[in-house]
Amino acid sequence: MNSERAQIANPPTQTPVPQQQEIPLAMVHGQPVLQIPQDLYIPPDALEVILDAFEGPLDLLLYLIRRQNLNILDIPVAEITRQYVDYINVMQELRFELAAEYLVMAAILAEIKSRMLLPRPPDIENEEGEDPRAELVRRLQEYERFKQAAEDLDALPRMDRDNSAAHAFVPDQTTVRIPPPVNMKELLLALQDVLKRAELFSGHAIRREALSVRQRMGDILAHLEGGKFHPFTALFTAEEGKLGVLVTFLAILELAKEQLLDIVQEASLGPIYIKSLATHHTNGALQLSSDFDNSPSTHVPP
Protein backbone atom coordinates (compact mmCIF):
# COMPACT_ATOMS: atom_id res chain seq x y z
CA MET A 1 0.00 0.00 0.00
CA ASN A 2 2.80 2.38 0.88
CA SER A 3 4.47 1.75 -2.46
CA GLU A 4 1.16 2.36 -4.27
CA ARG A 5 0.67 5.63 -2.35
CA ALA A 6 4.23 6.66 -3.26
CA GLN A 7 3.53 5.99 -6.90
CA ILE A 8 0.30 8.03 -6.74
CA ALA A 9 2.08 10.87 -4.96
CA ASN A 10 4.98 10.84 -7.39
CA PRO A 11 3.64 9.78 -10.79
CA PRO A 12 6.32 8.73 -13.32
CA THR A 13 7.50 11.52 -15.55
CA GLN A 14 6.77 11.08 -19.25
CA THR A 15 9.51 11.61 -21.79
CA PRO A 16 8.59 14.68 -23.85
CA VAL A 17 8.17 14.05 -27.55
CA PRO A 18 10.64 16.21 -29.48
CA GLN A 19 8.88 18.76 -31.59
CA GLN A 20 9.92 19.42 -35.15
CA GLN A 21 12.03 22.55 -35.41
CA GLU A 22 10.28 25.39 -37.15
CA ILE A 23 11.98 26.90 -40.15
CA PRO A 24 12.84 30.57 -39.52
CA LEU A 25 11.76 33.15 -42.06
CA ALA A 26 15.15 34.86 -41.85
CA MET A 27 18.29 35.19 -39.75
CA VAL A 28 19.03 38.66 -38.31
CA HIS A 29 22.34 39.09 -36.45
CA GLY A 30 22.47 35.33 -35.96
CA GLN A 31 18.97 35.16 -34.40
CA PRO A 32 16.11 33.36 -36.18
CA VAL A 33 13.01 35.35 -37.10
CA LEU A 34 9.92 33.13 -36.89
CA GLN A 35 7.22 35.74 -37.49
CA ILE A 36 7.02 38.81 -39.67
CA PRO A 37 7.23 41.99 -37.54
CA GLN A 38 4.09 44.10 -37.65
CA ASP A 39 6.01 47.29 -38.51
CA LEU A 40 8.08 45.65 -41.28
CA TYR A 41 7.53 47.28 -44.67
CA ILE A 42 7.79 44.89 -47.62
CA PRO A 43 7.77 46.45 -51.11
CA PRO A 44 5.00 45.21 -53.41
CA ASP A 45 7.47 43.60 -55.81
CA ALA A 46 9.55 41.88 -53.12
CA LEU A 47 7.61 38.62 -53.44
CA GLU A 48 8.62 38.26 -57.06
CA VAL A 49 12.24 38.00 -55.92
CA ILE A 50 11.29 35.35 -53.35
CA LEU A 51 9.28 33.33 -55.85
CA ASP A 52 12.10 33.42 -58.39
CA ALA A 53 13.89 30.89 -56.17
CA PHE A 54 11.00 28.41 -56.59
CA GLU A 55 9.80 27.06 -59.89
CA GLY A 56 6.37 26.03 -58.68
CA PRO A 57 4.45 24.40 -55.82
CA LEU A 58 6.41 21.15 -56.00
CA ASP A 59 9.69 23.06 -55.82
CA LEU A 60 8.57 24.91 -52.69
CA LEU A 61 7.33 21.69 -51.11
CA LEU A 62 10.58 19.90 -51.93
CA TYR A 63 12.51 22.82 -50.42
CA LEU A 64 10.60 22.53 -47.14
CA ILE A 65 11.29 18.79 -46.98
CA ARG A 66 14.99 19.00 -47.82
CA ARG A 67 15.52 22.00 -45.52
CA GLN A 68 14.69 19.82 -42.51
CA ASN A 69 16.43 16.67 -43.82
CA LEU A 70 13.15 14.75 -43.84
CA ASN A 71 12.60 11.42 -45.53
CA ILE A 72 10.62 12.03 -48.67
CA LEU A 73 9.00 8.58 -48.31
CA ASP A 74 7.69 9.42 -44.82
CA ILE A 75 6.55 13.03 -44.97
CA PRO A 76 5.12 14.53 -41.75
CA VAL A 77 2.10 15.93 -43.58
CA ALA A 78 0.73 17.95 -40.66
CA GLU A 79 3.91 19.99 -40.07
CA ILE A 80 4.74 20.39 -43.75
CA THR A 81 1.17 21.52 -44.48
CA ARG A 82 1.35 24.12 -41.72
CA GLN A 83 4.64 25.54 -43.02
CA TYR A 84 3.38 25.47 -46.59
CA VAL A 85 0.20 27.33 -45.65
CA ASP A 86 2.32 29.94 -43.83
CA TYR A 87 4.12 30.65 -47.10
CA ILE A 88 0.79 30.84 -48.93
CA ASN A 89 -0.56 33.34 -46.41
CA VAL A 90 2.48 35.56 -46.91
CA MET A 91 1.98 35.35 -50.66
CA GLN A 92 -1.71 36.28 -50.42
CA GLU A 93 -0.95 39.28 -48.28
CA LEU A 94 1.58 40.66 -50.75
CA ARG A 95 0.52 39.56 -54.22
CA PHE A 96 -2.46 37.24 -54.49
CA GLU A 97 -2.14 36.52 -58.22
CA LEU A 98 1.36 35.12 -57.67
CA ALA A 99 0.12 32.71 -55.00
CA ALA A 100 -2.83 31.35 -56.99
CA GLU A 101 -1.05 28.29 -58.39
CA TYR A 102 0.28 27.43 -54.95
CA LEU A 103 -3.26 27.20 -53.53
CA VAL A 104 -3.89 23.97 -55.44
CA MET A 105 -0.99 22.26 -53.69
CA ALA A 106 -2.22 23.60 -50.36
CA ALA A 107 -5.60 22.00 -51.04
CA ILE A 108 -3.92 18.68 -51.89
CA LEU A 109 -1.91 18.78 -48.66
CA ALA A 110 -5.07 19.56 -46.67
CA GLU A 111 -6.84 16.61 -48.28
CA ILE A 112 -3.97 14.23 -47.48
CA LYS A 113 -3.84 15.53 -43.93
CA SER A 114 -7.59 14.98 -43.44
CA ARG A 115 -7.45 11.47 -44.92
CA MET A 116 -4.65 10.52 -42.53
CA LEU A 117 -6.56 11.93 -39.53
CA LEU A 118 -9.87 10.23 -40.31
CA PRO A 119 -10.37 6.87 -38.55
CA ARG A 120 -10.36 3.83 -40.76
CA PRO A 121 -13.41 1.55 -40.94
CA PRO A 122 -13.19 -1.50 -38.64
CA ASP A 123 -13.47 -3.97 -41.50
CA ILE A 124 -10.26 -2.71 -43.17
CA GLU A 125 -8.43 -1.63 -40.03
CA ASN A 126 -6.18 -4.67 -40.09
CA GLU A 127 -5.62 -4.49 -43.85
CA GLU A 128 -2.79 -2.50 -45.31
CA GLY A 129 -4.39 0.18 -47.43
CA GLU A 130 -2.85 2.67 -49.80
CA ASP A 131 -0.93 5.51 -48.18
CA PRO A 132 -2.64 8.85 -48.98
CA ARG A 133 0.82 10.34 -49.45
CA ALA A 134 1.83 7.87 -52.18
CA GLU A 135 0.77 10.00 -55.16
CA LEU A 136 2.40 13.13 -53.71
CA VAL A 137 5.63 11.22 -52.99
CA ARG A 138 5.66 9.90 -56.56
CA ARG A 139 5.26 13.41 -57.97
CA LEU A 140 7.98 14.78 -55.69
CA GLN A 141 10.43 12.02 -56.67
CA GLU A 142 9.73 12.55 -60.35
CA TYR A 143 10.13 16.32 -60.00
CA GLU A 144 13.39 15.87 -58.08
CA ARG A 145 14.81 13.69 -60.85
CA PHE A 146 13.95 16.24 -63.51
CA LYS A 147 15.33 19.08 -61.41
CA GLN A 148 18.60 17.22 -60.86
CA ALA A 149 18.86 16.50 -64.58
CA ALA A 150 18.29 20.19 -65.34
CA GLU A 151 21.01 21.19 -62.88
CA ASP A 152 23.42 18.69 -64.45
CA LEU A 153 22.71 20.12 -67.90
CA ASP A 154 23.13 23.67 -66.62
CA ALA A 155 26.52 22.73 -65.16
CA LEU A 156 27.82 21.80 -68.60
CA PRO A 157 29.95 24.46 -70.34
CA ARG A 158 27.78 26.77 -72.43
CA MET A 159 28.85 28.94 -75.32
CA ASP A 160 28.74 32.69 -74.59
CA ARG A 161 28.30 31.92 -70.87
CA ASP A 162 31.33 29.84 -69.91
CA ASN A 163 33.21 29.90 -73.20
CA SER A 164 33.75 32.57 -75.79
CA ALA A 165 34.69 31.89 -79.36
CA ALA A 166 37.95 33.51 -80.36
CA HIS A 167 37.82 35.62 -83.49
CA ALA A 168 40.93 36.79 -85.29
CA PHE A 169 41.18 38.59 -88.60
CA VAL A 170 43.50 36.79 -90.95
CA PRO A 171 44.39 38.91 -93.97
CA ASP A 172 44.15 37.27 -97.34
CA GLN A 173 47.73 36.61 -98.31
CA THR A 174 48.77 35.06 -101.58
CA THR A 175 51.91 33.01 -101.19
CA VAL A 176 54.41 33.80 -103.92
CA ARG A 177 56.83 30.96 -104.40
CA ILE A 178 60.19 32.23 -105.62
CA PRO A 179 62.01 29.54 -107.60
CA PRO A 180 65.66 28.99 -106.72
CA PRO A 181 68.31 30.52 -109.00
CA VAL A 182 69.93 28.38 -111.69
CA ASN A 183 73.51 27.28 -111.27
CA MET A 184 75.79 28.02 -114.23
CA LYS A 185 76.86 24.38 -114.24
CA GLU A 186 73.26 23.31 -114.75
CA LEU A 187 72.91 25.82 -117.57
CA LEU A 188 76.02 24.46 -119.32
CA LEU A 189 74.74 20.90 -118.96
CA ALA A 190 71.52 21.93 -120.66
CA LEU A 191 73.54 23.56 -123.46
CA GLN A 192 75.56 20.39 -123.88
CA ASP A 193 72.37 18.40 -124.30
CA VAL A 194 71.13 20.76 -127.00
CA LEU A 195 74.47 20.57 -128.83
CA LYS A 196 74.33 16.79 -128.86
CA ARG A 197 70.94 16.89 -130.49
CA ALA A 198 72.16 19.45 -133.04
CA GLU A 199 74.87 17.05 -134.14
CA LEU A 200 72.21 14.61 -135.28
CA PHE A 201 71.22 16.96 -138.08
CA SER A 202 73.42 17.33 -141.17
CA GLY A 203 72.90 19.56 -144.18
CA HIS A 204 74.58 21.11 -147.17
CA ALA A 205 75.30 24.76 -146.63
CA ILE A 206 75.49 26.79 -149.80
CA ARG A 207 76.53 29.98 -148.08
CA ARG A 208 77.06 31.05 -144.52
CA GLU A 209 74.26 33.18 -143.13
CA ALA A 210 75.39 35.79 -140.67
CA LEU A 211 73.78 35.27 -137.29
CA SER A 212 73.39 38.29 -135.02
CA VAL A 213 73.27 37.92 -131.24
CA ARG A 214 71.30 41.16 -130.95
CA GLN A 215 68.78 39.92 -133.50
CA ARG A 216 68.48 36.62 -131.66
CA MET A 217 67.89 38.54 -128.40
CA GLY A 218 64.95 40.28 -130.04
CA ASP A 219 63.63 36.96 -131.39
CA ILE A 220 63.81 35.40 -127.93
CA LEU A 221 61.91 38.28 -126.31
CA ALA A 222 59.28 38.08 -129.02
CA HIS A 223 58.98 34.32 -128.46
CA LEU A 224 58.59 34.81 -124.71
CA GLU A 225 55.78 37.38 -124.91
CA GLY A 226 52.96 36.88 -122.43
CA GLY A 227 55.03 36.57 -119.26
CA LYS A 228 54.79 32.77 -119.08
CA PHE A 229 57.59 30.28 -118.45
CA HIS A 230 58.90 28.37 -121.48
CA PRO A 231 61.25 25.37 -121.52
CA PHE A 232 64.89 26.24 -122.05
CA THR A 233 65.19 23.79 -124.94
CA ALA A 234 62.22 25.36 -126.76
CA LEU A 235 64.33 28.43 -127.58
CA PHE A 236 66.80 26.43 -129.69
CA THR A 237 66.43 25.24 -133.29
CA ALA A 238 68.54 22.15 -133.87
CA GLU A 239 68.40 22.60 -137.65
CA GLU A 240 70.62 25.70 -137.29
CA GLY A 241 73.49 23.53 -136.15
CA LYS A 242 76.00 24.28 -133.45
CA LEU A 243 76.47 27.87 -134.57
CA GLY A 244 72.78 28.66 -134.19
CA VAL A 245 72.70 26.98 -130.78
CA LEU A 246 75.69 29.03 -129.58
CA VAL A 247 74.17 32.28 -130.85
CA THR A 248 70.92 31.55 -129.03
CA PHE A 249 72.79 30.66 -125.85
CA LEU A 250 74.82 33.88 -126.01
CA ALA A 251 71.61 35.85 -126.55
CA ILE A 252 70.10 34.24 -123.46
CA LEU A 253 73.16 35.16 -121.41
CA GLU A 254 73.04 38.76 -122.64
CA LEU A 255 69.34 39.06 -121.77
CA ALA A 256 69.95 37.54 -118.35
CA LYS A 257 72.79 40.01 -117.76
CA GLU A 258 70.42 42.86 -118.63
CA GLN A 259 67.84 41.35 -116.19
CA LEU A 260 65.37 40.86 -119.02
CA LEU A 261 65.00 37.12 -118.39
CA ASP A 262 64.07 35.02 -115.34
CA ILE A 263 65.75 31.61 -115.40
CA VAL A 264 64.53 29.05 -112.85
CA GLN A 265 64.99 25.36 -112.08
CA GLU A 266 62.72 23.44 -109.70
CA ALA A 267 65.28 20.78 -108.70
CA SER A 268 68.83 19.78 -109.36
CA LEU A 269 69.24 18.22 -112.84
CA GLY A 270 65.62 19.14 -113.50
CA PRO A 271 64.26 21.02 -116.50
CA ILE A 272 65.11 24.73 -116.84
CA TYR A 273 62.43 27.32 -117.58
CA ILE A 274 62.78 30.88 -118.85
CA LYS A 275 60.36 33.81 -118.60
CA SER A 276 60.60 37.31 -120.08
CA LEU A 277 60.83 40.24 -117.68
CA ALA A 278 60.82 42.91 -120.38
CA THR A 279 57.34 44.18 -119.54
CA HIS A 280 58.44 44.73 -115.92
CA HIS A 281 61.21 47.16 -116.89
CA THR A 282 59.83 49.43 -119.58
CA ASN A 283 56.70 50.18 -121.51
CA GLY A 284 58.55 51.54 -124.58
CA ALA A 285 61.00 50.08 -127.09
CA LEU A 286 63.99 48.15 -125.76
CA GLN A 287 67.53 49.13 -126.83
CA LEU A 288 69.38 45.83 -127.22
CA SER A 289 73.14 45.62 -127.61
CA SER A 290 75.77 42.89 -127.49
CA ASP A 291 79.54 42.79 -127.33
CA PHE A 292 79.51 39.90 -129.80
CA ASP A 293 78.11 42.01 -132.69
CA ASN A 294 79.52 45.03 -134.49
CA SER A 295 76.30 45.94 -136.27
CA PRO A 296 74.02 48.76 -135.03
CA SER A 297 71.80 48.16 -132.06
CA THR A 298 68.56 46.27 -132.61
CA HIS A 299 65.24 47.87 -131.63
CA VAL A 300 62.51 45.63 -130.29
CA PRO A 301 58.99 47.08 -130.54
CA PRO A 302 56.93 47.16 -127.35
UniProtKB/Swiss-Prot annotation:
It holds the Pfam family SMC_ScpA. GO terms for cellular component: cytoplasm. Signal peptide: none annotated. InterPro entries: ScpA (IPR003768), ScpA-like_C (IPR023093). Keywords: Cell cycle, Cell division, Chromosome partition, Cytoplasm. One of its GO terms (biological process) is cell division. Its main location: cytoplasm. PANTHER family: SEGREGATION AND CONDENSATION PROTEIN A (PTHR33969:SF2). Belongs to the ScpA family. Component of a cohesin-like complex composed of ScpA, ScpB and the Smc homodimer, in which ScpA and ScpB bind to the head domain of Smc. The presence of the three proteins is required for the association of the complex with DNA. Participates in chromosomal partition during cell division. May act via the formation of a condensin-like complex containing Smc and ScpB that pull DNA away from mid-cell into both cell halves. This is Segregation and condensation protein A. It comes from Xylella fastidiosa (strain Temecula1 / ATCC 700964). The gene is scpA.
